[in-house]
Amino acid sequence: MMGGICSRKRDQPVIEEGGVSRVVSGRYCKSSSSKWLGTSFFRSTVEQSPGVAGICPSLLELCISKICRDIDKYSSLSLLPRDVSQQIFNELVCSQSLTHDSLQAFRDCALEDVGLGEYPSVNDSWMDAICSQGSSLLSVDLSGSEVTDAGLALLKDCSNLQSLTYNYCDHVSEHGLEHISGLSNLKCLSFKRSSAISAEGMHTFSSLFNLEKLDLERCPEIHGGFVHLKGLTKLKSLNVRCCKCVTDSDLKAISGLTNLNELQISNCNITDSGISYLKGLQKLNMLNLEGCNVTSACLESISALVALAYLNLNRCSLSDEGCDKFSGLTNLKVLSLGFNSITDACLVHLKGLTNLESLNLDSCKIGDEGLANLAGFVLMKNLELSDTEVGSNGIRHLSGLKNLEKLNLSFTLVTDSSLKKLSGLTSLKSLNLDARQITDAGLAAITGLTKLTHLDLFGARISDSGANSLKHFKNLQSLEICGGGLTDAGVKNLKDLVCLTWLNLSQNCNLTDKSLEVISGLTALVSLNISNSRITNEGLQYLKPLKNLRSLTLESSKVTASEIRKLQFAALPNLVSFRPE
């Protein structure tokens, strides 16, 4: 059994008893913030209730769990199969149990992946053990660390390194960058928000001929350095979002990178003239220009990029003029035109884009007549119409979009009576009806949409009577009802929505501790907001069963921060964010 594990290739699926497939040497947990909210794969498996029939951790999982608990007893794990060591390492990172001292046990373990992004206390003293993996090391993430030039220098022995992520780090200089110039096998390199990446420093990249993905998002000093990328002919993805220093001349420098299929230049100082340099990038599949200083004139150049499947032109000062250029982009799957001065006249030119799966028209001057041009978008899954002039007459044009999964009608003119026209959209999973004119009658009209997992009724006027309709939405994972019309009686209708992980009932000022008693049964909750209510400290006892709760907001209530802290300490170990604090 152990020999079989040892022979597995990187990221090879393993079929265990019962037909369960998992991937060895993958990252079981990725943190999205420094608070490390992610839960570990092994912990969730091993700590399953022993009374649940049919659930039994594998011998390998039990062994790994045991080693993790006793990690301080081991001076070296180098005799273990590489994949087992990798899984132990991943588990310690995910549970935030890895320390500088316990890391030493992984010296010379031939680890392939060291993912320490935003992990606390990582500095140069960790790098010797990390780099002892030598030529086995393929991927390193040191984002948010205190690793300096000296630490980066040790990577020179990791000659097979394919991916290096060093985001949000302020302790490296241009001199330190030179240490990666010899890592000729690098395919992915990320230095988000780094002041060390200057035009001069970018010469380091010129020797990385195998580079396929480069991420320099929010790097403020890179203008003029794009000339050093000219020889990177294998480059497929370039991200320089939010680099205000990037101008048209920088795009001219990369106009010969004809293998590019993804270009992220949102919120850069790019004009229509700069976009003209992109016309030769015929393999470009994804282009993000959100927030650039372009106008409808740029559509002439964009129309030459016929392979585009993803195009983001949000906040680009577009008008109807020139929108006829969209008609030739028939491969588009995702088109974002939000926050532009386009009207129904623009939508006429989108009519033939029948491959569209997602369309964003947020805050555009779109009305009912314009929606008639969307009726043929049978592949549409996501439609954003928030803050438009769409009303009841326009909704009928959406009735044939049977594949629609996400629809945002917040702050539109849609009324209760028109919501009946959505009854056939049974694939809907997310619906936003945040509008004051929506009432109990509107909620009753959509009870057939039983696949809904996300329902936003934030500003809708839903009363206790209307809340009775919520019992039809058994699959709801997130729910917002903040119109002020709910009392404890209405909250009782939530008791069977056991899939809820995110619940916002703020602004319902008549809710009392009795509501918390009902909510105590919603044990999957991760986030709960009942601000502006009559909840008291006495009611906090009902939250004790909510072991998964990570965020609790009870502002403008009768609850004190000290009592929430007591609750956190006694019963809610996963609670990391609460208000009042």
Residue ranges and their predicted role:
Residues G539-E581:
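Leucine-rich solenoid repeat scaffolds
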